[in-house]
């Protein structure tokens, strides 16, 4: 694990939580990153287990996204989740994964409100998403799911294989997935 201790906080972790996993780019400041990093000091892992070392935690006063106090990592996460932009960002990621890339900003706000109003519970959100007109619209069909041939070829590429089986074998493989080529 990287260094993440009082006096040497790991700003990368704080930045990645906000940028990649919760809020997206531009919804926080460099000051917020530094303060969040301080709040996460003492957080680490050993193997696959979370470890908190209170002696390595910066328990001083912090200000993060307008919240002041002796904040720790849980406080930072709670503050991030309280931001409407977080729900909108996560709703957008889920929509783009399950439906299609093109997402109207007004719909993203509405989906974010739904996610947030349900305490970030995924089941009610997914039920709404999977039963939505957008999910079943012709322009959404097959935009996120690979067909059997595309799936087989991309699997070979990801495995680093240079040769794809000949027609009979490849047709048998894709046929088992529901799409015969020949």
What are these regions (language model features)?
Residues 46-51, 63-69, 108, 124-126, ...:
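Short, charged low-complexity intrinsically disordered segments located at boundaries
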Residues 83, 87, 91-118, 126-182:
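Flexible, low-complexity segments enriched for small/polar residues
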Residues 1, 35-38, 124-133:
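Short, functionally critical alpha-helical segments immediately adjacent to catalytic or ligand/cofactor-binding
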Residues 1-104:
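Non-catalytic, conformational "gating/processing" segments within enzyme and secreted inhibitor domains
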